[in-house]
From Swiss-Prot:
UniProt-listed InterPro entries: Homing_endonucl, Sporu_reg_WhiA_N_dom, Sporulation_regulator_WhiA, Sporulation_regulator_WhiA_C, WhiA_LAGLIDADG_dom
Protein's UniProt name: Probable cell division protein WhiA
Purpose: Involved in cell division and chromosome segregation.
Start-end of DNA-binding region: 275-308
Keywords: Cell cycle, Cell division, DNA-binding
Presence of the UniProt keyword 4Fe-4S in the record: no
UniProt organism field: Streptomyces griseus subsp. griseus (strain JCM 4626 / CBS 651.72 / NBRC 13350 / KCC S-0626 / ISP 5235)
Gene3D superfamilies: Homing endonucleases (3.10.28.10)
GO molecular function: DNA binding
Any one GO biological process: cell division
Family, as annotated: Belongs to the WhiA family.
The UniProt record lists the keyword DNA repair: no
Highest rank taxon of the organism: Bacteria
Family annotation (Pfam families): HTH_WhiA, LAGLIDADG_WhiA, WhiA_N
C-alpha cells in the first residue's frame, strides 16, 4: 500500500478516548477539509475526505461529541477525481456546530486559523489537530531525497497554526505557499518518523523507516567503489536507524516488557538491515512478518505510553542521538 493511504487508514482506526482530543481532531478536519455555506440564512457545514474510514469516523464523532446528526454522501470517481470522495454534511444545527468547533466566533464571524482551545490546549490536542489535518489533506511521499510529509491548508492562518502545533510537539515544520496554495511541510526524515508516531501511525512509521533504511543501504552499495571513511560512517547511520527506537523502548520498559515483545525488539536491534520477513525466519519459533511487525508496534506503543505517564522522552526522542552515535562510531 502507498504510504499516504496506509497512514490515513491506520489513524482513522486509532481509538481516542479523551474528549478534548476528539474535539480537536474534529475541529481540524472541518477546518482543513470543510467549508461553510449559507443556505436560506442558515449555516451548512461540509467536509470532503478521500477515505471512507475517515468520513465515518468524523460522522460518528460529530454525533457522539457534539450531538449533531450528519449525512454521508459518496461521490463516485469522475472528471479530475481518480477515486471516490466522501462528503460529511451537517444541515440541522450547522450554525451551532460551527461555534462548537471554532469555525466561527461567538458573533458568527469566521475564524481563519485553528480555534483558541486547540491552539492553547495540551500536547494531546496538538497531536489530535495534526491527525485531523492529515486525514483532511495530508500526504506522505516515499523515503528518498525529496521525502516529505505535507498538509494542504485552507489559508496562511491555518498553516501557521499547524506549524505552531508541530513546534509544541518539538517537530520542525515550515509553512510555504506554492502556486497560490498554502502548505505545511516536514522534510527531515527523523522528524517525519517522530510525527507519524505522534499521530499514532505505529505500523506506518515502521514501514516508512524500513523503506528509508533500505534505500540508504542500496544507495551505499551502489557507491561502494568510491567510498572513503566518511561515506562508510554514513552507511552506519542506516544500520543504527532501524534499532534506535526499539532500543529506547527496551530502556524505558526495563523488566516490565513482556518477553515475546522483548525478543522481537532484540531481533530488530541485532539484525538492523533484515526485512520483517527475514526477522520472522530468525525467530524461535519462526514468526510471520505481520507477527513481528505487530510485536514491535506493541513494544513501541507500550513504551511511548509508559514514557508519557512518567513524563520522560519517548522512543522517537532517542533516534537522532543514536544516529549521531552511529555516525561517530
Amino acid at each position: 500500500m502507498a504510504m499516504t493511504p496506509a497512514v490515513k487508514n491506520e489513524i482513522s482506526h486509532l481509538p481516542v478516548t479523551r474528549t478534548c482530543c476528539r474535539k480537536a481532531e474534529v475541529s481540524a478536519i472541518l477546518r482543513f477539509a470543510g467549508g461553510l455555506h449559507l443556505v436560506s440564512g442558515r449555516i451548512v457545514i461540509e467536509a470532503e475526505l478521500d477515505t471512507g474510514n475517515a468520513a465515518r469516523r468524523l460522522k460518528r464523532d460529530i454525533l457522539e461529541i457534539f450531538g449533531h446528526s450528519s449525512e454521508l454522501i459518496v461521490m463516485a470517481p469522475g472528471g479530475l477525481r481518480r477515486g471516490s470522495r466522501f462528503v460529511v454534511r451537517v444541515v440541522a444545527g450547522g450554525d451551532q456546530l460551527a461555534r462548537q468547533t471554532g469555525l466561527v466566533d461567538g458573533r458568527g464571524r469566521p475564524i481563519r486559523g485553528l480555534p483558541p482551545q486547540v491552539v492553547s490546549g495540551a500536547t494531546c490536542d496538538a497531536e489530535a489537530a495534526w491527525r485531523g489535518a492529515f486525514l483532511a489533506h495530508g500526504s506522505l511521499t516515499e523515503p528518498g531525497r525529496s521525502s516529505s510529509l505535507e498538509v494542504t491548508c485552507p489559508g496562511p492562518e491555518a498553516a501557521l497554526a499547524l506549524v505552531g502545533a508541530a513546534r509544541r510537539l518539538s517537530i520542525a515544520a515550515k509553512a510555504r505557499e506554492v502556486r497560490g496554495v498554502d502548505r505545511v511541510v516536514v522534510r527531515d526524515g527523523d522528524a517525519i518518523g517522530a510525527l507519524l508516531t505522534r499521530l499514532g501511525a505505529h505500523d506506518a512509521v515502521l514501514a516508512w523507516e524500513e523503506r528509508r533504511m533500505r534505500r540508504e543501504v542500496r544507495a551505499t552499495a551502489n557507491r561502494l567503489a568510491n567510498f572513503d571513511d566518511a561515506n562508510l560512517r554514513r552507511s552506519a547511520r542506516a544500520a543504527v536507524a532501524a534499532g534506535a527506537r526499539v532500543g529506547r523502548a527496551l530502556e524505558i520498559l526495563g523488566e516490565e516488557v513482556p518477553e515475546h515483545l522483548a525478543a522481537a525488539g532484540r531481533l530488530r536491534m541485532e539484525h538492523k538491515q533484515a526485512s520483517l520477513e527475514e526477522l520472522g525466519a530468525l525467530a524461535d519459533p519462526p514468526l510471520t512478518k505481520d507477527a513481528v511487525a505487530g510485536r514491535i508496534r506493541r513494544l513501541l506503543a507500550m513504551a511511548d505510553k509508559r514514557a508519557q505517564d512518567l513524563g520522560i522522552p519517548g522512543t522517537e526522542s532517542t533516534l537522532s542521538e543514536e544516529l549521531a552515535d552511529g555516525l561517530v562510531g
